[in-house]
């Protein structure tokens, strides 16, 4: 770099931002002839004015969203001094405005791939609203600069150099980012007061950065534009015809006074160094226009320096603030640009899989964009399902949440009453027909029931999740991850018992903390074990026998082991098994059992976790057994916490699918409702509530009847999340009401008794108490209850009217008949209207009990309020376990009542709504990771069995088309 050029850079960097400093000494732009006729257009003054305007805009943004700051990143490869000067100027201007500007300096050795990766990281960073790549690239290896500028997201290309933004400008779409120097030129022309429309404009120079975009901007400002360049003939004649002359040819003082039309506006974009012995620096800055001559002819003229240069930086800042404003606008935008899928209901209504196959789902990436997700927040699993990154919660942390609706049911028949179908009909009605931002949030179904008797759980008829095969089978593998994590813990538990029984303390300790390359070191999880034991030493070689013995030996009591292996199929022969029968296990065997995967405590942990850190802590806290002194043994004690978290890391991200009408559906976690809390994940609901925004709706469901799933949704899930539901939808059917009125048993696979296919008002009247108890259950939590009567073809209008009248008299907010199974969202519009009105009532939600109550008192509160029981009675074994859990510090946890789903009582054969009965609690255990104490009311199996004729008989794969057949 020449000494003359270095002096030029110093002069350039010192060029003042304050207009008051211009006009004396070294800063004078030809002061001797400043008194002549042309008006000087001060870019410095205009840029200062723009910066002040931008500073006010940034201040307003921070008031609109607390702590919001526009972000600019300036990427530089190498360390060219001229680039450093320009970067410092940009950062100085940004800081003055209130923009968070950072210099991302990368080494000369960087490769094109590495540079593209860095730019992609910035593209995906929500804190960054503008990115510029400083040119030229000062690199050791060849890098395609055009590819680099096009790698910057068009939405963050504040230099305006991306091909997309250039193309938008070329066709007159000025909604993209405009190149900074040409935009600055246009602003200077406008501020001169000269009318652009109809004027003759000549642009001298055709560079990508200045000449070409300047010509386009003038053209779309309605000037008549001619572009000239080094090959243009009669150049002087053409420029002399211009009312507006923009010069960026790169030749010092090329344009003479004779080239300029008298009174013309002349914008000089050039900057050159010219020797000048009269200057202390030995040189001066000049433009592409002979300034002295132009002053005599032009009407308006920009100086060099102090003309276009400051405007380039100012317009860069303006683009950055503009980008940040668009980000804020998208964040605050209330209405999704959702393209719904039309339904064409057929009569008679076809099977679920035929309906699902007839509807072509939209690409899941399209749906994700429609609902406001950024590409970096979505991991695609093919074209129809995706995972959503938890980073979306950080991006939307300040966004107001929508209305929260829980769909529950009356005590169901073995056939189910259509909660999921009603939920899907409701969200299709809200999203596709009422045009409200609406998200369904569902549990992922277990494969066990899918291949057993119940079938799938995607909804039914014209109110479904699609593709239903993906939904009902593997989806994205979350349940498999839960199974793997659960069984890893089970394997470590039995293995630890084996090793402790076959080794003495010292040998056990030496194997747990081995010397690696001559050095022994505790792992982080072992340090936590030491801390739990009150041992402060960190050097393994310093522990005494009294210290390393308790550290190495968990001393698990096999009779207290609560942890079971799992598999996600119905297998009755795994309900009781013996493990450790191989001779290699040296006679250390025990009786245990398998549960179905969704019954694992890890599934409940997944559903109740609020973050990765929260999940990891919950996994650590899981109690697998008690030691021989009665102290709890945890997953952390077994050293397995980190490994479990690794297996479950991706499973914590909710899955995105869609309804038959193209509205979004979140599918995540699937704990059973009779043995766990029976709700989808807190994280899925939270993501949904943020995405739908203030006026939107997230509709989720709670398993089985309100006495089971909804009670746990409120007392466990909402207590954990801190969210308060705005309304409860109570799903009922005439069929279920008749059953509770004394109707014949409803048996899967068997024809319905004619009591259910003919009008029978007497049975309906007798069965209403069951429905009314469920209405009371919702009211006990302060929620407005909307009864949705899921219409069946055998129902009669008189039966419907009887149910609606009774529901309203019992205090339901509304009672409507819904036909979503046959009609899709259109059949649930009345339900949607009722839900909207219910959510406008104001939130009066309250919990049922305080955690400080003793465990048995909490059980009694649930049983008497939710079930109508007189009291709970604990078996001696349950009483002993309550005492043990209370002594161990678990007395302040919420209660998860595990009981049959087909009755308010502990006996599934007792229907209706009995009062004052005794509820027997046979067993009590803690799910410390999930954060609740389970009370077992009677025998509830955690491993279903296959029926005589399971659904597998009808399920097949068409090897010609690859389609799955027979799912329902």
Curated annotation (Swiss-Prot):
SUPFAM superfamilies: Aminoacid dehydrogenase-like, N-terminal domain, NAD(P)-binding Rossmann-fold domains, P-loop containing nucleoside triphosphate hydrolases
GO cellular component terms, A-Z: cytoplasm; cytosol; mitochondrion
BP terms from Gene Ontology: amino acid biosynthetic process; L-histidine biosynthetic process; methionine biosynthetic process; purine nucleotide biosynthetic process; tetrahydrofolate interconversion; tetrahydrofolate metabolic process
Transmembrane segment boundaries: none
Region (Methylenetetrahydrofolate dehydrogenase and cyclohydrolase): 1-338
Pfam families cross-referenced by the UniProt entry: FTHFS (PF01268), THF_DHG_CYH (PF00763), THF_DHG_CYH_C (PF02882)
Chain residues that bind substrate: 86-90, 133-135, 305-309
Annotated protein name in UniProt: C-1-tetrahydrofolate synthase, cytoplasmic
Organism (species): Drosophila melanogaster
Gene name as annotated: pug
């Amino acid at each position: 770099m020449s000494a003359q050029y270095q002096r030029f850079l110093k002069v350039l960097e010192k060029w003042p931002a304050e207009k008051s400093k211009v006009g004396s000494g070294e800063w004078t732009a030809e002061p001797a002839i400043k008194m002549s006729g042309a008006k000087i257009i001060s870019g410095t003054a205009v840029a200062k004015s723009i910066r002040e305007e931008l500073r006010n805009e940034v201040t307003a943004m921070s008031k609109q969203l607390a702590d919001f700051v526009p972000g600019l990143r300036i990427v530089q490869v190498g360390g060219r001094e001229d680039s450093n000067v320009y970067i410092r100027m940009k950062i100085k201007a940004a800081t003055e405005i209130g923009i968070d500007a950072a210099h991302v300096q990368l080494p000369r050795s960087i490769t094109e791939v590495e540079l593209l990766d860095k730019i992609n990281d910035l593209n995906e960073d929500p804190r960054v609203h503008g990115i510029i790549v400083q040119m030229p690239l000062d690199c050791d290896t060849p890098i395609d600069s055009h590819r680099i500028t096009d790698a910057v997201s068009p939405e963050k290309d504040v230099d305006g150099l991306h091909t997309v933004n250039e193309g938008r400008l070329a066709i007159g779409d000025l909604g993209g980012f405009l190149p900074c120097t040409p935009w600055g030129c246009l602003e200077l022309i406008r501020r001169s007061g000269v009318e652009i429309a109809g004027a003759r404009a000549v642009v001298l120079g055709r560079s990508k950065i200045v000449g070409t975009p300047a010509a386009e901007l003038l053209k779309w400002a309605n000037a008549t534009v001619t572009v000239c360049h080094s090959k243009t003939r009669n150049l002087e004649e053409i420029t002399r015809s211009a009312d507006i002359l923009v010069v960026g040819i790169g030749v010092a003082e090329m344009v003479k006074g004779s080239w300029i039309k008298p009174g013309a506006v002349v914008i000089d974009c050039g900057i050159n160094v010219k020797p000048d012995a009269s200057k202390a620096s030995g040189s001066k800055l000049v433009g592409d226009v002979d300034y002295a001559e132009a002053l005599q002819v032009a009407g308006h003229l920009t100086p060099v320096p102090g003309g276009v240069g400051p405007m380039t930086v100012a317009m860069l800042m303006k683009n950055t603030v503009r980008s940040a404003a668009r980000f804020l606008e998208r964040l605050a935008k209330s209405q999704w640009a959702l393209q719904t899928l039309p339904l064409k209901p057929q009569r008679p209504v076809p099977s679920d899989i035929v309906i699902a196959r007839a509807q072509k789902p939209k690409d899941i990436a399209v749906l994700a964009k429609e609902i406001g997700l950024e590409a970096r927040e979505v991991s695609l699993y093919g074209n129809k399902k995706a995972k959503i990154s938890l980073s979306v919660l950080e991006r939307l942390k300040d966004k107001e949440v929508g209305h929260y609706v829980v769909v529950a049911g009356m005590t169901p028949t073995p056939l189910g009453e259509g909660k999921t179908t009603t939920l899907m009909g409701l969200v299709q009605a809200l999203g596709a027909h009422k045009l409200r931002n609406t998200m369904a949030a569902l549990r992922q179904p277990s494969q066990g029931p899918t291949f057993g008797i119940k079938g799938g759980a995607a909804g039914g008829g014209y109110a479904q999740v699609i593709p239903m095969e993906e939904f009902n089978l593997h989806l994205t593998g979350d349940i498999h991850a839960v199974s793997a994590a659960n069984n890893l813990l089970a394997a470590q538990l039995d293995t630890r018992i084996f090793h402790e029984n076959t080794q003495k303390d010292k040998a056990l300790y030496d194997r747990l903390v081995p010397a690696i390359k001559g050095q022994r070191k505790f792992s982080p999880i072992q340090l936590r074990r030491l801390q739990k034991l009150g041992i402060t030493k960190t050097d393994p070689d310093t522990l005494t026998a009294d210290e390393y013995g308790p550290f190495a030996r968990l001393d698990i009591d096999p009779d207290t082991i609560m942890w079971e292996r799992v598999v996600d199929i119905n297998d009755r022969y795994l309900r009781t098994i013996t493990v450790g029968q191989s001779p290699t296990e040296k006679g250390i065997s025990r009786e245990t059992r398998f549960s179905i995967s969704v019954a694992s405590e890890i599934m409940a942990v997944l559903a109740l976790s609020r973050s990765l850190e929260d999940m990891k802590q919950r996994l650590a806290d899981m109690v697998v057994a008690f030691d021989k002194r009665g102290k709890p043994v945890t997953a952390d004690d077994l050293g397995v916490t980190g490994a479990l978290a690794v297996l479950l890391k991706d499973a914590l991200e909710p899955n995105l699918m869609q309804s038959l009408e193209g509205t979004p559906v979140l599918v995540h976690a699937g704990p059973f409702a009779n043995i766990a809390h029976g709700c989808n994940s807190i994280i899925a609901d939270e993501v949904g509530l943020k995405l739908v925004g203030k006026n939107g709706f997230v509709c989720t469901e709670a398993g089985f009847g309100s006495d089971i799933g909804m009670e746990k949704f409120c007392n466990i899930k909402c207590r954990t999340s801190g969210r308060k539901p705005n309304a409860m939808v109570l799903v009922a059917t005439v069929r279920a009401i008749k059953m509770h009125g004394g109707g014949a048993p409803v048996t899967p696979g068997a024809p319905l008794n004619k009591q259910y296919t003919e009008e029978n008002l007497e049975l309906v009247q007798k069965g209403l108490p069951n429905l009314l108890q469920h209405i009371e259950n919702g009211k006990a939590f302060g929620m407005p209850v909307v009864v949705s009567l899921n219409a069946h073809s055998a129902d009669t209008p008189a039966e419907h009217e009887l149910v609606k009248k009774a529901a309203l008299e019992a205090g339901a907010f509304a009672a409507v008949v819904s036909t979503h199974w046959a009609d899709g969202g259109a059949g649930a519009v009345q339900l949607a209207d009722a839900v909207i009105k219910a959510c406008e009532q104001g939130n009066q939600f309250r919990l049922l009990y305080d955690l400080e109550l003793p465990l048995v008192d909490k059980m009694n509160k649930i049983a008497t309020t939710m079930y109508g029981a007189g009291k709970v009675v604990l078996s001696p074994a349950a009483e002993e376990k309550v005492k043990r859990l209370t002594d161990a510090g678990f007395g302040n946890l919420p209660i998860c009542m595990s009981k049959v789903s087909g009755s308010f009582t502990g006996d599934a054969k007792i229907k209706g709504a009995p009062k004052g009965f005794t509820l027997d609690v046979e067993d009590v255990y803690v799910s410390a990771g999930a954060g609740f104490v389970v009370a077992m009311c009677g025998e509830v199996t955690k491993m279903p069995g296959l029926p005589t004729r399971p659904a597998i008989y009808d399920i097949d794969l068409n090897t010609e088309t690859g389609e799955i057949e027979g799912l329902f």
